[in-house]
Amino acid sequence: MAIAVGQAAPEFALKDQSMKEVKLSDFKGKKNVVLVFYPLDWSPVCTNEHACFVNDMKQFETLDAEVLGVSVDSAWSHKAYAEKMGIKYPLLADFQPRGAMAEKYGVFLADKGITGRAIAIVNKAGNIAWFKQYDIPVVPDLKEVASALAQVKAASA
């Protein structure tokens, strides 16, 4: 079952592509967090999605947000993928146990062994402020995400 707006966001501690541990609590009280759940590195739709985030990163930074990508790929896969794609934001490895974080957020597709496509915005208080799941072949509308993030930022001002 997917998470609900208003509930506390489940904590996590995962390695990024630099092998650095990233915890949700690192951002509490400091930044809003945009969790970008995606199925797999290197797939065409995921590559398009990340290209959109890379191109729009300034907008997300001005909205006081940290973008974190999350998939079941290893940190090593994330490292190669981020270098090839020019991704500067953290890509978190929900690798072992496979999909454990995605499971907490209700977006792990156990029958496929991958993370579903979804975006969650966690506000500075650590609560789910916005959440949307997408069909696997759909690239999320980043204007919609940015609009939701602007509302979250305004609500915390």
Model-derived regions, located:
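Chalcogenol-based redox active-site neighborhoods
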Residues: 1-157
